[in-house]
Amino acid sequence: MKYDYLVVGSGLYGAIFAHEANKRGKKVLVIDKRPNIAGNIYTEEVEGINVHKYGAHIFHTNNKEVWQYITQFAEFNRFTNSPVANYKGELYSLPFNMYTFNKMWGVVTPEEAAAKIEEQRQEIKGEPKNLEEQAISLVGRDIYEKLIKGYTEKQWGRPCTELPSFIIKRLPVRLTFDNNYFNALYQGIPMGGYTKMVENMLKGIEVRLNTDYLENKEELDSLADKVVYTGPIDAYFNYKLGTLEYRSVRFETEVLDKPNFQGNAAVNYTDAETPWTRIIEHKWFEFGTQPKTVISREYSSEWKLGDEPYYPVNDEKNGALYAEYKKLGDAETKVIFGGRLGEYKYYDMDAVIAAALAKVKEVFE
């Protein structure tokens, strides 16, 4: 059986490419080494709740074309991301807004809040030398100490004084009472979970799970004229130029015999002492009324080969190494490299969709 396209990985990029190729009459085989489809947006039903197995995914975009495209596969609810920060039992609104400043300093007007931030920013003179100085120069010491420092150090596994200032280009400060984290026109969660959405994309397409492409590369390559590869690009080339680095995340998920644990989908723990970075309570993504609840504690961790890769470490060294791998990739005429791992890129979901659609256009039009 000969296929036009072998698509390696059933995450957003792979699923969209497969859907569009199939729609154009191409014969497509999708494979995934996991026992399930949907890549990192996979949701699993537990106690009637759609659990985001690989971390919280909240869809948001300003791109109308992307929104119109994705909503043909699922109806989206009106979920708005409004995280809460817990600093040693003190609760603050994220993003930083008037609720945050009122709680922090007792200020009531935007003018008072702006004056307080301006006063605290003066501590840093000249060019910020590291992330700590950068953050203080943007929002002042109080907000930095309580809401940025501990969280960031847990995330990156090193002190803020050793992290480069460019990691935090800007910190959104809102002198309003708006709790909506994303400034996006369109936002929500697919009702019934992301897995169902990806299932709809892959309707009528052959999918083989528990199939590791790199372990059976020759045999699988012989099945198709072209390959769309969405795995790690360095793994494709057997790491021959070296290993690209990632940050990883570990989740501890549990079912609780109560209807409400924290009253919000996401609570960030911004002190250094709490080992987890945040707790996700999954039912609130879909305004759940189930009698039980499912929570996931999220821990940032150093990544080593074999761990699940989450966030590319986009520093100079890794960027230069990726550029070398990209040259090798460009020389593979039979293979399209795409997605977060194939392009070693921190992609929001809407950007992955846009990239996949752009590639479809390039290939088929």
Residue ranges, per PLM feature:
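N-terminal Rossmann-like FAD-binding beta1-loop-alpha1 element of flavoenzymes
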Residues: 3-30, 360, 364
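Short, solvent-exposed loop/turn segments at secondary-structure junctions
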Residues: 12-13, 35-36, 99, 153, ...
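Glycine-rich FAD pyrophosphate-binding loop
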Residues: 19-47
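Mid-domain catalytic core of redox enzymes
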Residues: 24, 214-328
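Short glycine/proline- and charge-enriched loop/turn segments
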Residues: 45-53, 178-181
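N-terminal FAD cofactor-binding segment of flavoenzymes
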Residues: 56-90
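Active-site/ligand-binding neighborhood in enzyme catalytic cores
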Residues: 85-93, 98-226, 230, 234-237
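C-terminal catalytic lobe of FAD-dependent flavoproteins
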Residues: 308-365
